[in-house]
């Protein structure tokens, strides 16, 4: 258990912005930070990075105060029931010669963010984030397999209290992970082929994150991240015309504006520069509409001759980091196909779930992903479990192969606390909600080969 308090003081002048963090919240400490931020703003003006941008371009004062409170139906400060639940989960499987390791855990993070501009309260937001975790590893005849329920990237993360645990439905997850791991250790390896690929929502989380979310970050497109996190195959001239995916692909920035996503992991009322968070489409039936860029990044793009729209995604990981363009809740709209429809549509292919490994180039284009669990499908029927399934592709063409999108019965609201970006590094919470999806003519292989 840890606590942290502090403030990030921002100074804005014409053609310049400066940030200075302090844990000293006394008037003297805040004044010292303000003086430092102002000096840095003068330095950035001399770099020309914000040339021709006025104070209002850089930071516009909102006309209202934004408030957010994680929607919690019932929560108690008594954590004994949570501890009892975790202990019961840990005791749900018995130690055997095959069981190598197991773990079950739950992390709760409570935070409050306030924004003041020119002495006026702009935003007061309170969040409760829950992050459960379950893993079991077995070794059978020299073959080791690990199964996460909650996933390698903890995709069950949501906002909420006791109600969030009920929505996650994780009771019995450790026993399920143990059973899956045993079955995987005895299963054949994934076949090497080109064929249909069905991705379940917890793997769609990683696919969305790496090959839609990161490439669309506007500061990356502007070149800010090339020294650390890389660039993007997306360029400013693509917005409004480029066909990013098939007509089945609609992707939106959703800061929790719908009942289904109200408790998604990165829901909020405004970003950390005071911009109102609104539901906006990023990709509309395959066509690239707008980037993942905050107001300041959009103004910089305008000065280059590209009048792109912005979303409220200027986010900081904490009081000691400046806001930068980040993913928040990046979601794919459901389609009309049931899970049975998806399976029946496949002549030969593999269904994959739960990411275990990932690799993608620094322009977020060529990628390779490995999953924990796969099912081979032939003639519209599931044939059986396969282990070490993997697939590879190219973002610029992969989403064009999207041929079917699952309906709301296949839709899951997920999230991860593990998005890293920025110098110095910032770890951000992001949400990804998606149905199951089918892709055609994908290169499939065994990651153990």
Where are these regions (language model features)?
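Short acidic, glycine/serine/threonine-rich loops at helix termini
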Residues: 110-128, 144-152, 207-213, 262-266, ...
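Dual-mode signal for accessory low-complexity, basic/Gly-rich regions
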Residues: 29, 227-230, 234-449
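N-terminal alpha-helical targeting/anchoring segments
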Residues: 1-42
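Extended amphipathic alpha-helical scaffolds
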Residues: 80-165, 200, 219-252
